[in-house]
Amino acid sequence: MAVLLTGKPVADALSADTRTRAEALLSKGVQPRLVLLRCGDNEADGAYIRGAVKRAALCGVAAELRTLPADASADVVAAAIDAVNRDPAVHGCLLLRPLPPHLRGEESALCARLTPDKDVDGMTPESAAAVFTGQGRGFAPCTAEACMTLLRHYGIDSCGRHAVVIGRSPVVGRPVSMLLLRENATVTVCHTKTPDTAALTRKADIIITAAGAVNSLTAAHVRPGQIVLDVSMNWNGTGLCGDADFPAVSSIVEAITPVPGGVGSVTSAVLMAHTVRAAEYLTGEGGA
């Protein structure tokens, strides 16, 4: 049976450091503040928001939920983002995505509207450029950075190792590939047009799967000695699960993250760390 790379100790360690930094800001009269902005009221967002608000309290971050109508126009969402940009008391903003179907065509433009210094989830072009180049102030998307934080916490060095990333989304696959390259890993990215993903994953030292497909990572994809980070949160009809056929894969590989309780539980802690670092920079009261 594989070693379980659980997220709680990782999130707790990061949260303790974040709270120390938040308390230093509070002693100077600065309350780190995060706005969670969403359109509509769906349960999937609700579960994430509840976890984020709980983590914010542990980290000394004030989290405020601003909910727009599900049928809000692009102009209404833009105005809400502009309000965040203008408010000096707000240091970070997370726009819950995906947006409702009628706004999907406007999503990129709305994300780009946020002031980059308040972009704590890597959704602006400036943040993407910083992740790609390794230069600038932009934050990586929280889930991608959570993968790297988890690897570091468990002493898993990606330098010189072959990492296979399954998925190429701008939220996980692409940015985590860039972060792995920054750590001198050799990275292969698989996607829906990859002809034989299993042939590539079997050669990997580290597998990060973010396909969003139940049981898409099977025993045929893995070998002994590998590290598997399962990023996806899928519904299999009875509960949450990742991409991996967990019983089969965990009986073969060296270590694996559970779902739930793995990478996802670290993501909200990264979000709070980003918010405090943004507050340090925006107020000039810390070394972000």
Question: Can you name each region flagged by the protein language model?
Answer:
Residues 38, 94-98, 166:
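Short beta-strand segments
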Residues 108-129, 230-283:
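Rossmann-fold NAD(P)-binding glycine/threonine-rich loop
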Residues 92-158, 215:
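Anion-binding alpha/beta catalytic cores of soluble intermediary-metabolism enzymes, centered on
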Residues 39-53, 137-227, 231, 239-247:
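Glycine-rich phosphate/diphosphate-binding loop of Rossmann-like nucleotide-binding domains
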Residues 1-30:
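Positively charged, low-complexity intrinsically disordered leader regions
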Residues 24-34, 40-58:
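N-terminal glycine-rich anion-binding loops that anchor highly charged ligand groups
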Residues 76-88:
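Short, well-structured alpha-helical segments in soluble
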Residues 56-70, 187-189:
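Short beta-strand elements in bilobed, periplasmic/extracellular small-molecule ligand-binding domains
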